[in-house]
């Protein structure tokens, strides 16, 4: 009998061609960046397990950077949506929390809040995530602290139905883009950090410099979203640089 988890965390490793891979072996508090993300996710109290899903080109690097107790799923597949569907066959679960591997400040408390909100929804939902004040999914923003929740059966349905290339690359895009087919729940992103002048993802050296400045100021163990918001609120010069980067890379 196959054991089925209630909720599985899946960290999607950035592709080998991404800017993040250039920085992936850099270290924070002695840990490679990808290990750092993995350990923040495993701090969640409501995930039954965590795996990393990587494309074939990135798998060798991922296996050297991901802690040995966290499986890396890198089976060959035509696209990432197909790879996720295959991963869910190997790791059966009722629901998934999807985390981007470049979300350095992914917040385990926000992951747990998301799971609770999805499970306690008045009507059963297929997808839940944080929504930004601009009406877009907050996971698409450069704030970089959010995750998204979905039922495994919704992912399998998307895998069968999605034809557009972008829907095959961005594994949840088909689901949240079709509210007529799936029950969607949006949770308001925290106003304190849902801002145009906040950027906590990493795509270049400027982002890396900001990350180091933040960790130097707050320490590696005090990086919850509230602490980040309070710190950035008193850093107008840093926020101006972040806003400029967000505008330039939009």
State what each model feature region is.
Residues 47-51, 198-199:
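Short active-site oxyanion
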Residues 57-122:
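Short phosphate-binding loop-to-helix
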Residues 1-21:
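N-terminal nucleotide-binding beta1-loop-alpha1 segment
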Residues 204:
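Short, conserved phosphate/pyrophosphate- and ester-handling motifs at nucleotide-, phospho-/glycolipid
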Residues 33-48, 61:
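A short, N-terminal amphipathic alpha-helix
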Residues 23-28, 144:
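Short glycine-enriched, charge-decorated loop/helix-capping segments at active-site entrances
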Residues 6-11, 34, 49-52:
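Hydrophobic targeting segments
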Residues 106-198, 209, 213, 230, ...:
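Conserved core of the sugar-phosphate nucleotidyltransferase
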């Amino acid at each position: 009998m196959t054991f089925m988890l209630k909720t599985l965390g899946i960290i999607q490793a950035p592709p080998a061609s991404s800017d993040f891979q250039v920085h992936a072996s850099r270290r924070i508090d002695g840990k490679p960046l990808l290990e750092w993300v993995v350990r923040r996710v495993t701090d969640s109290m409501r995930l039954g397990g965590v795996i990393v899903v990587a494309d074939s080109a990135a798998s060798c690097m991922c296996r050297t950077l991901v802690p040995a107790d966290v499986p890396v799923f890198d089976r060959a597949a035509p696209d990432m949506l197909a790879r996720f569907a295959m991963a869910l066959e190997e790791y059966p679960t009722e629901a998934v929390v999807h985390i981007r591997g470049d979300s350095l400040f992914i917040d385990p408390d926000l992951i747990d809040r998301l799971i609770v909100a999805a499970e306690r929804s008045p009507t059963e939902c297929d997808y839940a995530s944080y929504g930004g004040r601009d009406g877009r999914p907050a996971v698409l923003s450069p704030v970089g602290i959010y995750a998204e929740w979905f039922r495994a059966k919704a992912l399998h349905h998307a895998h069968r139905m999605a034809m557009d290339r972008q829907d095959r690359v961005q594994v949840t895009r088909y689901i949240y883009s079709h509210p007529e087919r799936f029950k969607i729940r949006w949770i308001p992103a925290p106003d304190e950090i849902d801002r145009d002048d906040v950027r906590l993802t990493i795509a270049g050296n400027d982002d890396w410099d900001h990350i180091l400045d933040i960790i130097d100021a707050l320490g590696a163990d005090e990086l919850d979203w509230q602490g980040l918001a309070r710190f950035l609120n008193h850093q107008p010069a840093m926020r101006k640089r972040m806003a400029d980067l967000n505008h330039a890379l939009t």
